[in-house]
Amino acid sequence: MNNSRMSSVSTQKTTGRSALGTKSALAAIIATTMMVSVASAASLQTTKATEAASTGWATQSGGTTGGAKASSSKIYAVKSISEFKAALNGTDSSPKIIQVTGAIDISGGKAYTSFDDQKARSQISIPSNTTIIGIGNKGKFTNGSLVVKGVSNVILRNLYIETPVDVAPHYEEGDGWNAEWDAVVIDSTDHVWVDHVTISDGSFTDDKYTTKNGEKYVQHDGSLDIKRGSDYVTVSNSRFELHDKTILIGHSDNNGSQDAGKLRVTFHNNLFDRVGERTPRVRFGSVHAYNNVYVGDVNHKAYRYQYSFGIGTSGSLLSESNAFTIDNMKKISGRDKECSVVKAFNGKIFSDKGSIINGASYNLNGCGFGFSAYSAKIPYKYSAQTITTSLAGSISSNAGYGKL
């Protein structure tokens, strides 16, 4: 993927040129300089921007601080894609805090015209030691992806991110139309904290899909991908809503050489509202999910609930005190309908402690999937509160952007 960075204005040859050309070049230089200064001239608008991850896997092996050590010259306030790119400054890994004070259209208001065009302009690379935080309820991103790839120590907080719409999905025989582009990608990266972030299909929901060649023209991929040996990730107090294939941890059954022993991820105090599946689906990784709320409907017209926890090849998951409210649940393969919140994809390790399904306790360990109990030690301090319908309501109310 391409790194987006501010490019300086090249020196123009003056031979045979009019004074108008020289003035145009000067104007471009001034405009570029002003753009950088707008991105650079900012005071810290919230002390939340200097906070580090306080629990979960992101606290381990040195912790996750993002841009907490940023100097005053590396604190920015941005409200446009040009300002955002200027603040990121390409691959500059010096600590920085980027405060998002407006709705940022990553496309810059120019519609994508092809796969190549969307790939070139919609994928925004985030460098190491960066905190990106929305101010109030103003921090929004549309028409693109935040790509955290090959870096370390990144924090995303208090943001609304609309899942991108693929303008040129590809067709796979036997599998139909498939889309690219996730809202957030964590790839080959360690130490990431995602907190109070809302990711949603927003204005373009799946019931608006058309058909092409007789099949549904799918234009959404995932909300969040964590893959290729990424490690030490915490996702907290966030809201995932109105989406189908939501969170993937480990992208392939054949990537064990890179993923084994990594992909350690914590999910706590999140709301998954009207999402179809993969919250998460895990391969190779070790996932700890506690005090999360899952709301869905098997008969939903756009986002039919299928399952929450997908246990894939060499993946393991510990569930503690989660709340599932799923309408129109049905028995699958002769098992109790409550067992449908878990799906086995060749995975062998899963345990649940104290979760409730539709307001009542249920033993998910007795569903007959043949899982071994999760026995790995959780190395960080945490507090999984006893889940009740009242607590589930509080978690839901606090989840997502604008609540920090």
From Swiss-Prot:
Gene name as annotated: pelE
Q: Where in the cell is it found?
A: Secreted
The cofactor remark states: Binds 1 Ca(2+) ion per subunit.
The molecule here is called: Pectate lyase E
Q: Which SUPFAM superfamilies match?
A: Pectin lyase-like
A single GO molecular-function term is:
metal ion binding
Which Pfam families does the UniProt entry name for this protein? Pectate_lyase_4
The biological pathway it contributes to is: Glycan metabolism; pectin degradation; 2-dehydro-3-deoxy-D-gluconate from pectin: step 2/5
The cofactor required is: Ca(2+)
Database matches in InterPro entries: Pec_lyase, Pectin_lyas_fold, Pectin_lyase_fold/virulence, PEL
Tell me which residues this entry annotates as catalytic.
Answer: R278
Q: An example Gene Ontology cellular component term from the record?
A: extracellular region
A GO BP term, please? Answer: pectin catabolic process
Reaction catalysed by this enzyme: Eliminative cleavage of (1->4)-alpha-D-galacturonan to give oligosaccharides with 4-deoxy-alpha-D-galact-4-enuronosyl groups at their non-reducing ends
Task: Give me the residues that bind Ca(2+), please.
Answer: D182, D225
As for family, the record states:
Belongs to the polysaccharide lyase 1 family. PLBC subfamily.
Which EC number(s) are documented for this chain? 4.2.2.2
Xref: Gene3D superfamilies: Single-stranded right-handed beta-helix, Pectin lyase-like
